[in-house]
Amino acid sequence: MALWGGRFSQAADARFKNFNDSLRFDYRLAEQDITGSVAWSKALVSVGILTQDEQLTIEAALNDLKLAVLENPEQILQSDAEDIHSWVETQLIAKVGDLGKKLHTGRSRNDQVATDLKLWCKQQGEQLLMQLDKTQQQLVSLAREHQHTVLPGYTHLQRAQPVTFSHWCLAYVEMLERDFSRLTDCLKRLDTCPLGSGALAGTAYPMDRTELAHTLGFASATLNSLDSVSDRDHVMELMSTASMSMIHLSRLAEDLIFYNSGESNFIELADAVTSGSSLMPQKKNPDALELIRGKTGRVFGSLSAMLMTLKALPLAYNKDMQEDKEGLFDALDTWSDCLEMAAMSLVGMKINEERTKEAALGGYSNATELADYLVAKGVPFRDSHHIVGEAVVAAIAKGVPLEALTLAEFKAFDVLIEDDVYHHLSLDETLAKRKAQGGVSPVQVEFALTNAEKRLEERDTSGISIRAAR
């Protein structure tokens, strides 16, 4: 049943109907549409459109419909309704007769869909907060387990300075913390209720929109009806947050793919998140991580499409805005799936500590320590940098690490070098010196790890829904 047939003398062309209808994707808003309709029925009592008994009849029918939808949402797709709003109204009328025709009084699909979408974003956003938290918890657990596991640090994919596996884990904990903060901010900004804004000019019925907003769990009502039905900032913000987080997940995936390679041999991923080859029986491929990396572009694409769709749209509602849902659903579904796979990939991962230490000792990654050693002896850093560069060339020519050069060979580069240089070039000393806040020294890693554990432990997730939006 179309909700707008009276103006037209001819039926819509079937091809146009197929092009125009949105039920095939906005059916995912069924639960939110029903929830909004129950709240609207209560508001209609306050302005004398429905009696209390009529409202209770409508609410009971809508609640029955919601239960049926939650049990089998795909049943909706068997209908030829234009959209989820039409489907819900048709089902309600089938249950309660002409009484159901009163429900849409004073309401437009414009404020209705804006409300449905915000309700969906709130629910799905809260679920994503839980998933971010879970991934952080897994990283922190791994960091605690491998607090003293040495790992080569890289710049330009060249070994640069030694770090620890714990320090590496905590780097991604910080990235996901920013994602958590961004998502929290998004959810705060979208926590306003558009219902009661009508098509664009506001409803003609003097209901209390603040009470209506609170009934639906929003912090407040929106302040401008024209903006309310036009606003899709929350869609773009959530997609932007998803895109930023996917960058972090993609970098995590790429690091682990590199560490898992035969050339690095730093880690071995669990069988549960890898697959094999149809031809090469020896292969164990990091497919979960590669898909995280690959799906990142998919999320970026959804954001880009949404930005282009809304650019230069006139106020208020335009049919272009129907394009907000598929990209949003796909972007947040993809982000959710990738968070789950990232957390799973960290479980059961074996770390080859001997190999990571061997790699950390190679590549002359203690060269900076020799430069700092000379600085402590009074040599200007720029001069010490040049001296150490020459020493590295000599060590490479000899085929030995820096610390294998003899004292006489060191003194050929600078007479200030003494026996204590070997202590300064040791791996333990290299790590221990990085004791400024945020550094890789054991003291600072313990400090950062303890703070991360405390932060996650004290995080209040009690008000977060544990059920994802469909």
UniProtKB/Swiss-Prot annotation:
GO terms for molecular function: argininosuccinate lyase activity; L-glutamate N-acetyltransferase activity. Pathway: Amino-acid biosynthesis; L-arginine biosynthesis; N(2)-acetyl-L-ornithine from L-glutamate: step 1/4; Amino-acid biosynthesis; L-arginine biosynthesis; L-arginine from L-ornithine and carbamoyl phosphate: step 3/3. Keywords: Acyltransferase, Amino-acid biosynthesis, Arginine biosynthesis, Cytoplasm, Lyase, Multifunctional enzyme, Transferase. It comes from the Bacteria. Signal peptide: none annotated. Residues 1-470 are annotated as: Argininosuccinate lyase. Pfam families: ASL_C2, Lyase_1. It is found in: Cytoplasm. GO terms for biological process: arginine biosynthetic process via ornithine; L-arginine biosynthetic process. In bacteria which possess the bifunctional enzyme ornithine acetyltransferase/N-acetylglutamate synthase (ArgJ), ArgA fulfills an anaplerotic role. NCBIfam families: argH (TIGR00838), PRK12308.1 (NF008964). PANTHER family: ARGININOSUCCINATE LYASE (PTHR43814:SF1). HAMAP family: Arg_succ_lyase (MF_00006). In the N-terminal section; belongs to the lyase 1 family. Argininosuccinate lyase subfamily. In the C-terminal section; belongs to the acetyltransferase family. ArgA subfamily. This is Bifunctional protein ArgHA. It comes from Moritella profunda. The gene is argHA.
